[in-house]
Amino acid sequence: MNADTAPFWRRKTLDQLDSKEWESLCDGCGLCCLQKLEDEEDNSVYYTSIACKLLDLQTCQCSDYPNRFKHVPDCIQLTPGKADQFKWLPPTCGYRLVSEGQDLPAWHHLVSGDRTQVHEQRISRSGRMLSENDVDEDDWEDHLIFRAG
C-alpha cells in the first residue's frame, strides 16, 4: 500500500488529525472510563472493573458525553498534545497505538468496519463491570483487573 492510499492513522501524526479522525480512533472499549488506583510505592496504575457512573455497562459508551465534564469534573480528556502521557491507556487503545507508531488491530472498527468486534473479541469489559454507584470506594481494591503500562 503506498502512502497516498494508506489509512489516515498511518499517514498522519496525531497532531495532523482532524476532529472526526481523532474521535474515530476510539474503539469504544470504555476501558479509559474505568476507575484506576495508583500504587503509592511505585506509582503503578491499576485498572479496576468499576466504571464511571456515566458509562453504560453494556455498550461501553458514555451516557452523557457532551456534558460529561459537568457531571464528572475529573473526567479525562484525551488530546494529541497529551500523547506522551498515553502509557496509562490500555495497550489495545487506538490513541496509544497510533501515538507509539503502531497499527490498529484487526478487530478495530476502522480496520474491520464492525463496531461490535471490540465487544465480541472481549477487548471491552461489556457486561463485566460494576458502576461506581454500586461499590464503596474502600472496596475498589477488591476489583483490580490489570496494571497499566
From Swiss-Prot:
Listed Pfam families: CxxCxxCC (PF03692)
Entry-linked InterPro entries: Puta_zinc/iron-chelating_dom, UCP006173
Family: Belongs to the UPF0260 family.
NCBIfam families given in the database record: PRK05170.1-5 (NF003501), PRK05170.1-6 (NF003502), PRK05170.2-5 (NF003507)
HAMAP family per the UniProt record, alphabetical: UPF0260 (MF_00676)
Protein name stated in the entry: UPF0260 protein PSEEN4031
